[in-house]
Swiss-Prot record:
It is an enzyme of class 4 (lyase). The active site is at residues 37, 144. GO terms for molecular function: lyase activity; nucleic acid binding; ribonuclease A activity. GO terms for cellular component: extracellular region. Substrate binds at residues 32, 35, 66-70, 91, 110. This is Ribonuclease pancreatic. The keyword Hydrolase applies. It is found in: Secreted. It comes from Acomys cahirinus (Cairo spiny mouse). Glycans are attached at residue 87. It catalyses: an [RNA] containing cytidine + H2O = an [RNA]-3'-cytidine-3'-phosphate + a 5'-hydroxy-ribonucleotide-3'-[RNA]; an [RNA] containing uridine + H2O = an [RNA]-3'-uridine-3'-phosphate + a 5'-hydroxy-ribonucleotide-3'-[RNA]. The lineage of its organism: Eukaryota, Metazoa, Chordata, Craniata, Vertebrata. Keywords: Disulfide bond, Endonuclease, Glycoprotein, Hydrolase, Lyase, Nuclease, Secreted, Signal. The gene is RNASE1. The keyword Lyase applies. Residues 1-25 form the signal peptide.
Length: 149
């Protein structure tokens, strides 16, 4: 009797695991935003090689060089709070963008003109600017970095 139950439960367990497993390793838009744009520690953000190191570490130079990226050096909670601040229109025309009330510490990374994959070389620029992020979900969190102004 015990063996029969095991033989019935095993295929059921396999089905459940097959259904659950794909979602386990999937990066959500909010997780992608954090990976690509958040660096609260910002420990070496003043280094001229900061962008080269971070763009590689955060997997934005796999297969091609991402042309432009911004890292925000503020606590995640402060960046998430932007989603309840001034509503503005996104560059793509959508209405789910929000502008920070105050200037935040950021680092802009721009691909140098003569740089080609796989040798992605970035110009590092440290600034204090307002950020504009697109927000979605429940809870309402940043999912896209739209601009810095």
């Amino acid at each position: 009797m015990g063996l029969e139950k095991s033989l019935i439960l095993l295929p059921l367990l396999v089905l459940v695991l097959a259904w659950v497993q794909p979602s386990l390793g999937k990066e959500t838009p909010a997780m992608k935003f954090e990976r690509q744009h958040m660096d609260s520690a910002g420990s070496s953000s003043s280094s001229p090689t900061y962008c080269n190191q971070m763009m590689k570490r955060r997997e934005m130079t796999k297969g091609s060089c991402k042309r432009v990226n911004t890292f925000v050096h503020e606590p995640l909670a402060d960046v998430q709070a932007v989603c309840s601040q001034k509503n503005v229109t996104c560059k793509n025309g959508k209405k789910n963008c929000y502008k920070s009330r105050s200037a935040l510490t950021i680092t802009d990374c721009r691909l140098k003109g003569n740089s080609k994959y796989p040798d992605c070389d970035y110009q590092t620029s440290h600034q204090q600017k307002h950020i504009i992020v697109a927000c979605e979900g429940s809870p309402y969190v940043p999912v896209h970095f739209d601009a810095s102004v």
